A protein has these predicted regions:
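Glycine-rich phosphate-binding P-loop
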Residues: 76-93
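Conserved phosphate-donor/acceptor-positioning beta-strand/loop module used by diverse small-molecule
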Residues: 211, 222-247
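Ligand-binding pocket scaffold of soluble enzyme catalytic domains
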Residues: 196, 209-211, 219, 305, ...
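Post-Walker A helix-loop "phosphate-sensing" segment adjacent to the P-loop in P-loop NTPases
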Residues: 93-103
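Short His-Asn-centered micro-motif
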Residues: 77-79, 209-213, 298
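N-terminal signal-anchor transmembrane helix
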Residues: 55-74, 105-109, 114-115
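PAPS-dependent sulfotransferases, especially Golgi type II membrane carbohydrate sulfotransferases
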Residues: 1-56, 64, 173-178, 183-189, ...
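PAPS-dependent sulfation machinery
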Residues: 106-208
Length: 368
């Protein structure tokens, strides 16, 4: 148990942003009175820590900037709460993979300089379980990279955690890339490539393993960046995904937000953005070369993760399963008995899913 409770954090994750990014994200946005103290403290810590960012930038340019990637990444896609974290943890047992860590999500500019000191303090302060679902939390565990990207540039969907009134705007522009400018897209390409190189350097891997739900809406751009990337798309019962996402977003946003959003508005955003993400993926998966995409139901993966992992490796021609199998088996064995949240779907939840997400129920063959 960490020193601080997640929902009582006096600052939010923008403390790890560079100063230029912090200013760009918050410029022209009104901070609600209840959060101005958190905003000011976050701003002050960010301003202080960002003075250290040039130290990493110097090392990055010297060691990594001109070094090409050995392999295109493997991307685990799927809407939030579709089981992507479990799959990410399973695949990351393979040491040829490199990944973004929990520490890196908050302090992406303090990776190549100062990491031991700041990581030790973060480990001491943070909880050891994810408050929404009891999944383990630790500074060196694999983590999705969107929070790290949000601290490296202002062009990410996760700005909505801080400014939720603009969630739909951020979704259209930075989740789906519908309204993004060429200049913003170039920044995304450069910063994401930089994050990948630092992640591989940090974890010692040779191929980047990404678990990042927002990438589900960016398939066309990702294929352009990485023509031979492999994609695993996870599907899960939409009733479970809705209930779990609503719970996850409602709880996670509390210590991060700098303005209020009503539960009703957040719920409507979950419903509409799920549909946007679903249709964007369905439209753009055609750009993935044949043999580089595998679509998997999470329920099938969860039922026999070992066999399914081997099947995915072989289907996508990912090397190294035999060498990684003992570590993967050990991790999966350690998850037996893990208590997941149990959801009961009331009549209203069932109605909302059936009215808004019938397309997914029908295509994937799910029912209550």
């Amino acid at each position: 148990m960490g020193l601080l409770e997640f929902n009582k954090l006096p600052i939010n994750t923008l403390v790890g942003a560079d100063w230029k990014t912090f200013k760009a994200i918050t410029a022209g946005r009104e901070i609600d009175p209840a959060y101005r103290g958190k905003y000011r403290l976050t701003k002050a810590v960010c301003r202080l820590l960002s003075t250290l960012a040039p130290l990493q930038e110097k090392r990055y340019r010297k060691l990594l900037a001109d070094k090409p990637l050995e392999h295109d990444p493997v991307f685990i896609l799927g809407h939030w709460r579709s089981g992507t974290t479990f799959m990410h943890n399973v695949f990351s047992c393979d040491k040829h993979f490199g990944y973004n860590t929990t520490y890196q999500t908050v302090f992406p500019h303090l990776m190549m300089w100062g990491q031991p000191f700041f990581k030790e303090n973060m480990s001491w302060l943070m909880p050891d379980k994810r408050p929404t679902d009891n999944m383990e939390l630790a500074v060196d565990l694999p983590q999705e990279e969107e929070f790290a990207l949000a601290n490296m540039m202002p062009y990410t969907y996760y700005n909505f955690w801080f400014l939720p009134k603009y969630q739909q705007e951020y979704a259209d522009k930075y989740l789906l890339f519908n309204d993004i400018s060429d200049e913003e897209l170039k920044v995304f390409e450069d910063i994401f490539t930089k994050l990948i190189k630092i992640s591989l350097w940090n974890t010692g891997g040779t191929q980047f393993l990404s678990k990042n739900p927002p990438h589900t809406g960016r398939v066309k751009e990702l294929v352009k960046m990485f023509p031979n990337a492999k994609f695993i798309y996870l599907m899960r019962n939409p009733y479970t995904v809705f209930e779990s996402t609503r719970n996850f977003f409602t709880n996670t946003i509390q210590p991060l937000k700098l303005e209020d959003i009503s539960p009703e508005a957040l719920e409507q955003n979950v419903l509409s953005i799920y549909a946007k993400l679903y249709h964007k993926y369905e439209a753009d998966k055609q750009f993935i070369p044949e043999g580089n995409l595998m679509e998997v139901k999470f329920e099938d993966f969860e039922a026999d993760a070992m066999a399914m992992t081997e099947h995915i490796y072989k289907s996508l021609s990912i090397p190294g399963f035999e060498a990684a199998a003992p570590a993967i088996s050990q991790y999966i064995g350690g998850k037996k008995g893990y208590k997941k949240n149990k959801y009961k779907y009331d009549d209203r939840t069932v109605r909302l899913v059936e009215e808004n997400w019938k397309f997914a129920l029908d295509q994937w063959g799910y029912s209550i």
